[in-house]
Amino acid sequence: MKHFRDLDLSSYSLSSVSGFLPERPALERLPNPYYDHWEDLSRNLPQLVASDTLKDKLERLPILSTALLDSEEEWRRAYVVLSFLSQGYIWSGDQPRRNLPIAIAAPLRRVSEYLTIMPCGTFAAYCLWNVIPSPKFGNPQINPEDFISTCTFTGSKEEEWFYVISVAIEARGGRLIPKILDAIDAVKENDTPRVRSFLEAFITCVDGIILVLDRMGENLSQEFFYHRLRPYLRGGKNMAQVGLPDGIFYPLCQCEGGEGEWLAYSGGSNAQSSLIQLMDITLGTCQNVEFIKEMRNYMPGPHREFLELMTSVSNIRPYILSLGNDSDVRSLYDKAVLRLAALRDCHLRVVARYILIPAGKKNPSGHRQLQERGRGTGGTDIMKFLRETRNNTLSACCEQSKGSTVVQTYPKRCETCGSGPIDRTTLIKKATVVINEIEC
């Protein structure tokens, strides 16, 4: 391949327009009536959860074959439906259920094997393959209002808002992928103006993502997320404190030898977004954070392969470091790094609002929920993870070597970072204050 920008993105299930989102809208329902059992249950999932009848329905469900799934879109739809049903089964009772029904576990494992993704609730199940463009809006679809969810646990617009925020972020970021590929070529050709143009586009893209993320509070309350939605997004990993020391038991069909095995997977997490990891790879930030690397295992296989390819060819940071200390492109790179740090600060504020603060409050039934304080849906220590990712991002700045201060303006709506000029030292101090206030 002469030019990296000529890479066939479709071979990695990517689009030059929608990025990691499907180029064609995901299915709202499997077309074959054979799968009506699954689809009817998923459509009625909020009612079944609310009436505590999901367990009985799933335990009496017949085992359906995956042989009639006819296209990539159908396999993805099956994965979404089975993931929602499995998560609903595990977490809808007073205590988590440790054994999945075989009618869910067996096809979920087969579908996941086909799609090369983990057989559990993931970012792909909740967002990438679950959310579709709203018929009310035309192109381009880059705002939360432009999308709707096909499956939910609660039937609430608040839950849908949580998913469509993430999808709007993916939609905005997807258009950056061709520019990243061209920037790699630009470095090889020593075309500094093209690198400069890419960094400007990168900054604009991250600005747009921050504005979307900062809208989470418009239609999602703390209480709803923490007490009603968050439990369904959890995994079985690191969950001994709630009665899952070994994770979840996935039974096998007799044709597979019978019995089964205990599997402990992380819950769905935005750390499973390939887009954000691609941004890190592109700028050369956060390359040694173990949790981020682990989360690649929960991405669709083709997306994971694309990130591995990009890791092997990423060349922007070495090129920037080769430029003179007075290079305006070097300063622009630092500006891009600080934008990415600003995004992580915005994420910190969202986590504080929806996990850390309500964790110390009484839930609607009057019981305090302290056993998971400080843990994200992925099962990790959220504060440790956020510290590590932000510090890794900031450490990529080059400004120390040129003896001057990088001054930067952040999007006005990102309250954590402020709207005025801010240098790297100030950003670190502000971030530390935010973390200390949250932990207190």
From Swiss-Prot:
The keyword Metal-binding applies. GO terms for biological process: 'de novo' NAD biosynthetic process from L-tryptophan; L-tryptophan catabolic process to kynurenine. Disruption phenotype: Does not completely abolish the production of quinolactacin A2, but leasd to substantial attenuation of the titer to about 5%. Pathway: Secondary metabolite biosynthesis. One of its GO terms (molecular function) is indoleamine 2,3-dioxygenase activity. The keyword Iron applies. Keywords: Dioxygenase, Heme, Iron, Metal-binding, Oxidoreductase. GO terms for cellular component: cytoplasm. It holds the Pfam family IDO. Its cofactor is heme. Binds 1 heme group per subunit. Its EC number is 1.13.11.52. Heme binds at residue 347. It catalyses: D-tryptophan + O2 = N-formyl-D-kynurenine; L-tryptophan + O2 = N-formyl-L-kynurenine. It comes from the Eukaryota. PANTHER family: INDOLEAMINE 2,3-DIOXYGENASE. Monomer. This is Indoleamine 2,3-dioxygenase qulI. It comes from Penicillium citrinum.
